[in-house]
Amino acid sequence: MGIIVFYEGNNGTQNIVQTVEDTPGQNFRPVKNDEIRSAKIYGVRQGCEIGVYDSPDGATNDDFCIINVKRETPEYTINTFERSYEDEYVVVTFIRNNGLDGKISRIKIN
C-alpha cells in the first residue's frame, strides 16, 4: 500500500495535515478544511488517481486538481496543486477558478 501525506505548506513543508493510504474508492473531507497546499507520495501504485477539490462536495465547477500516478516511486513531492504538468512519474491537471492551494475541502482517491 502506498502512502499520501498532505502538507500545510507548499513543497511538502510545514505541518502534516493528514496521511492516508492509496486505497481506491476514498472520498472524504480533510481533517482540517482549507489547510492543504502540497503532498508527498510514497510508493503510491501506478494508475492511482488523487483528486483535490475546493468544493466541499467535490464539484468540478470550482478549482480542482487531479494527479494521475504513471509510475510508482519511493518518494515524490507535489509542490503545489496550482500547476498542470507531466513527468515520468505523474500527470497533474489543474483547473483554475480562484486558487486551490490552502483551500482544499474534498479529497478523492481511486
What kind of feature is each model-predicted range?
Residues 1-110:
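Compact beta-sheet-dominated domain cores in extracellular/mature segments
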